[in-house]
């Protein structure tokens, strides 16, 4: 029997061919997918996160949004759900946990785009709707934390079962920290939530649930900042907390630090684009970058008097895609049709409903 090492390497999958690759599955990226379908462009979406919604869902899923036209108030989660429903008639494929790594333009003007997990796309245009770039966890500024990552120090909770019967400290004051502390208390031997102050940036309902759990003796809450980790035999033993009264030690086998996400342009910064303050410079007539065929919309776009509003991103995506059409179909002249009179669109919406 041949060993795996002696078997021929599997041939790589052929590139996925589409008109536009949308980088980012946040609100602007989702609306762009709908708008692409409306004007006759095929598209696919990639996002480095494990869920649709981008910054909205990662940072403030249940916070109200008041400045979306015709929607007096909705949560970020509700907005994302509505945008998903809106683009459903065109059923755009969405590839999650795929970070775009490299782009290369061929002699025919089309782009080859590769992700960190092996997907390859052959596209006429690229629409960057990646918010402030990829989001990465804000990590502890402690050297001793690095060798413990994924074993005793964590920046996410892949599986609750991994913490069964353990002493766990959850650090942070946002929705993610409180929600995971509440979930972990059901499987861990003991859970302690640590935050630098007694106030939180989480939803009121989460804060109330946490306080009830503390009062019931189901978990603990301590005000303080993590100042150090006590490591013994390559394992976490305790955490040093700094607070007004001084320093104390808190026993812990696992530390889950949920300080939120920080923006990182990542490989996009190496694409040869004109960048200003971590954002991509664009021409406001069509939101095209300094490299023709690559567009930037939403928070990642930079231009004079730029407003970081979801509404602005919708407008930017609409204009960018109309220019992208000329790259996908250079021989065609696109004819504008108001959506009210677009019979094909009405048929698709009806079928999806």
UniProtKB/Swiss-Prot annotation:
The EC number(s) this enzyme carries: 1.18.1.2
Oxidoreductase among keywords: yes
Pfam families, sorted: Pyr_redox_2
Binding site for FAD: 47, 55, 60, 100, 135, 299, 340
Keywords carried by this UniProt record: FAD, Flavoprotein, NADP, Oxidoreductase
Flavoprotein found in the keyword field: yes
Catalytic activity line of the entry: 2 reduced [2Fe-2S]-[ferredoxin] + NADP(+) + H(+) = 2 oxidized [2Fe-2S]-[ferredoxin] + NADPH
Cofactor: FAD
Annotated InterPro entries: FAD/NAD-bd_sf, FAD/NAD-binding_dom, Fd--NADP_Rdtase_type_2, Ferredoxin-NADP_redctase_2
Cofactor: how bound: Binds 1 FAD per subunit.
Recorded GO MF terms: ferredoxin-NADP+ reductase activity; flavin adenine dinucleotide binding; NADP binding
HAMAP family hit by this protein: FENR2
Subunit structure: Homodimer.
Family as reported in the entry's similarity comment: Belongs to the ferredoxin--NADP reductase type 2 family.
Record-given protein name: Ferredoxin--NADP reductase
């Amino acid at each position: 029997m041949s060993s795996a090492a002696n078997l021929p390497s599997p041939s790589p999958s052929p590139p996925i061919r589409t008109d536009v690759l949308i980088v980012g599955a946040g609100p602007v990226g989702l609306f762009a997918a709908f708008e692409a379908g409306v004007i006759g462009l095929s598209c696919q979406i990639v996002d480095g996160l494990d869920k649709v919604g981008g910054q909205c869902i990662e940072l403030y899923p249940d916070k109200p949004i008041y400045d979306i036209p015709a929607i007096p108030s909705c949560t970020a989660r509700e907005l994302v759900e509505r945008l998903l429903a809106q683009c459903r008639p065109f059923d755009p494929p969405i590839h999650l946990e795929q970070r775009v790594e490299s782009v290369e333009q061929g002699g025919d003007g089309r782009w080859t785009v590769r992700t960190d997990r092996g997907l390859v796309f052959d596209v006429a245009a690229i629409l960057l709707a990646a918010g402030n770039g990829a989001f990465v966890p804000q990590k502890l500024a402690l050297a001793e934390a690095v060798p413990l990552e994924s074993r005793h120090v964590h920046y996410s909770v892949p599986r609750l079962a991994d913490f069964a019967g353990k002493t766990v400290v959850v650090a942070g004051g946002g929705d993610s920290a409180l929600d995971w502390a509440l979930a972990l208390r059901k499987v861990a031997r003991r859970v302690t939530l640590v935050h630098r102050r007694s106030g939180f940036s989480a939803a009121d309902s989460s804060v109330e649930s946490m306080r009830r759990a503390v009062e019931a003796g189901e978990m603990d809450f301590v005000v303080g900042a993590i100042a150090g980790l006590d490591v013994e035999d390559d394992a976490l033993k305790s955490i040093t907390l700094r607070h007004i009264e001084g320093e104390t030690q808190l026993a812990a086998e696992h530390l889950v630090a949920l300080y939120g996400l920080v923006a990182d342009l990542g490989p996009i910064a190496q694409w040869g684009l004109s960048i200003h303050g971590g954002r991509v410079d664009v021409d406001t007539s069509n939101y095209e970058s300094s490299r023709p065929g690559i567009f930037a919309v939403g928070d990642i776009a930079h231009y004079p008097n730029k407003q970081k509003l979801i509404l602005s991103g919708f407008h930017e995506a609409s204009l960018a895609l109309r220019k992208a059409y000329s790259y996908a179909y250079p021989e065609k002249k696109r004819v504008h049709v108001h959506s009210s009179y677009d019979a094909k669109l009405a048929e698709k919406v009806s079928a999806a409903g």
